[in-house]
């Protein structure tokens, strides 16, 4: 139970911590600052751990998404969604859900996305809601299409709904695969027999569905999110005690993000958060003086590049709630893990050289000040 009275429902944090420690031999390495290698000279290596948690698709008030799924004359499908793919793979995930529900290949799905003139309202690409909120809206719309396909097929094949299955763009009678109708034929039958119905489905999904709009703003009490993601991260850093230069050499993320619909995209999100935390920890800082920005260009404001990246490893923790039932019960992934790896980096610097820094970025100057080598 959280301080606001919310119930996290499902938490894999303990398992995340245990797996992260085991995978990195954390207990064996921590507290034993050591040279990075036999020939590294003044470079010391340390290890640190951090944990994080984040909401899924809600912030201050509930958010919602709507989608439409339409069967085309040739048996392919068009998905209409307001979801915006900014590189996180939202379009891929949403098409995967349609493909799974309707048992057809991904190449048979056309997606029309983020066109405010033609697509329904969407939560947007923020607060980690695309896979959970928009994904469930797509599931609902796809389910409506599936039910219409089954209903038309049951009438034409003179079979009960319980005896019908979807397979390879056909509806067939279980145990009698020769008794089947293609999606293309079912669309034609629907238009002929059902007043031109082209077989369409609409889906709507809202977060914290049982709560009123704008819940508990005055008291901060109540339900704020359907679920919370958890993670534990371990960082290994190397610090040069003569120059103060520090770098991240290894990052391990063990996450409880519900059921990973697309593990490759999950790993991409994790790599992204490691990169963001790397910039936060060692480089990025807006310098201000008398209301003016002193480093307004990319020459002065440093950000990580491919040359600064560290080895990143990702381990899934799928808790029992998500292994049994509740389809597409994803949690947040990527956005909230920046805080965990940042804390791990800070703890690793402390483990390496005994300097506890409370201000980012951890520049050579701040590390050398902590070591007492400069004032």
Give the label of every model feature segment.
Residues 1-15, 22, 28-375:
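Cofactor-binding beta-sheet edge motifs in enzyme active sites
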């Amino acid at each position: 139970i959280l301080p606001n009275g919310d119930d996290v429902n499902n938490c894999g944090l303990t398992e995340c911590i245990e797996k992260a420690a085991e995978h990195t031999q954390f207990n064996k390495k921590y507290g034993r600052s050591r040279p990075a290698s036999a020939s590294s000279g003044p470079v010391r290596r340390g290890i640190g751990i951090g944990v994080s948690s984040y909401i899924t698709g809600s912030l201050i008030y509930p958010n919602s998404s709507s989608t439409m799924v339409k069967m085309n004359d040739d048996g392919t499908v068009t998905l209409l969604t307001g979801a915006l793919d900014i590189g996180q793979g939202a379009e891929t995930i949403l098409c995967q859900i349609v493909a799974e529900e309707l048992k057809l290949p991904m190449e048979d799905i056309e997606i029309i996305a983020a066109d405010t003139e033609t697509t329904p309202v969407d939560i947007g690409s923020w607060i980690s809601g695309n896979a959970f909120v928009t994904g469930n809206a797509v599931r609902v719309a796809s389910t409506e299409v599936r039910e219409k396909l089954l209903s038309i097929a049951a009438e034409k094949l003179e079979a009960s709904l319980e005896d019908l299955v979807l397979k390879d763009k056909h509806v067939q009678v279980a145990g009698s695969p020769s008794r089947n109708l293609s999606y293309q034929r079912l669309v034609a039958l629907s238009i002929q027999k059902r007043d031109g119905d082209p077989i369409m489905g609409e889906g709507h999904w809202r977060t914290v569905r049982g709560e009123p709009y704008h819940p508990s703003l005055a008291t901060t009490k109540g339900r704020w999110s359907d679920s919370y993601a958890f993670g534990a991260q371990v960082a290994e850093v190397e610090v040069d005690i003569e120059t103060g230069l520090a770098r991240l050499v290894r990052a391990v993320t063990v996450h409880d993000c519900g059921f990973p619909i697309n593990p490759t995209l999950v790993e991409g999100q994790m790599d992204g958060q490691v990169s963001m935390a790397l910039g936060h920890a060692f480089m990025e800082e807006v310098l201000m003086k008398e209301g003016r920005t002193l480093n307004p260009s990319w020459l002065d404001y440093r950000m990580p590049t491919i040359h600064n990246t560290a080895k990143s490893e990702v381990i899934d923790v799928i808790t029992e709630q998500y292994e049994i039932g509740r389809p597409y019960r994803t949690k947040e992934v990527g956005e909230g893990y920046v805080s965990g790896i940042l804390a791990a980096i800070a703890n690793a610097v402390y483990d390496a050289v005994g300097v506890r820094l409370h201000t980012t970025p951890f520049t050579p100057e701040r590390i050398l000040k902590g070591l007492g080598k400069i004032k």
